[in-house]
Each structure stands twice: as structure tokens, then as C-alpha cells.
């Protein structure tokens, strides 16, 4: 199956928007769990977004990029949804650190 570059870019953009929307809905899924299981989290997505913007000459701050991914200011999201990491989560994160 051959997909032209324009269509591929549109499909990738739609997939990214769907992923971001899914993560906004799944506030029960903590970033540390994402990091431990998949090696990335919402903060990683926002950093990659900011880096991609910079490659195109678009200046975005970390807070601006995080708001794009979180759908609200990061501090607000943390207050509403972030839970204290358990000792087990912290240990798993430390053990997987070289993979991040």
C-alpha cells in the first residue's frame, strides 16, 4: 500500500490528536505509570511537540507545549489529577531509568 506524503502526514496528525485526546480523558493513568510501562509520558509528548515546533522555527515554551498536551495548564492538571507516587512506582521508575 502506497500512501503519499501529504496523506501520511494527515494520518499521523490525526493519530496524534487521538492519542492526546485519549490521554486527556484517562486522567486516572499517572505519568509515572506511563513511564514505567512505555518509557514516555505526557511530559515527553509535550517536549517532543516543542522540539518539533522549534525545528519549524516556531517558539513554544515548556508550559505552552504542556498545555497543548494536557488541555490545561500543567500545574492545574497536577493539582486535579496527579497522585503521590507509591514506593513501588518510584522503584520501578528508578530501575527503568536507563531505558528512558
Give a label for each model feature.
Residues 2-100:
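Domain-level signature for proteins that mediate thiol-based redox and metal-cofactor handling
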Amino acid at each position: 500500500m502506497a500512501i503519499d506524503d501529504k496523506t501520511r502526514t494527515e494520518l499521523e496528525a490525526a493519530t496524534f490528536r487521538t492519542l492526546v485526546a485519549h490521554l486527556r480523558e484517562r486522567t486516572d493513568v499517572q505519568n509515572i505509570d506511563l513511564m514505567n510501562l512505555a518509557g514516555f509520558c505526557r511530559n515527553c509528548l509535550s517536549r517532543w511537540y516543542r522540539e518539533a515546533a522549534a525545528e519549524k522555527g516556531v517558539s513554544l515554551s515548556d508550559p505552552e507545549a504542556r498545555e497543548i498536551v494536557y488541555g490545561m495548564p500543567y500545574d492545574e492538571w497536577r493539582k486535579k489529577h496527579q497522585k503521590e507516587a507509591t514506593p513501588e512506582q518510584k522503584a520501578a521508575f528508578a530501575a527503568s531509568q536507563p531505558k528512558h
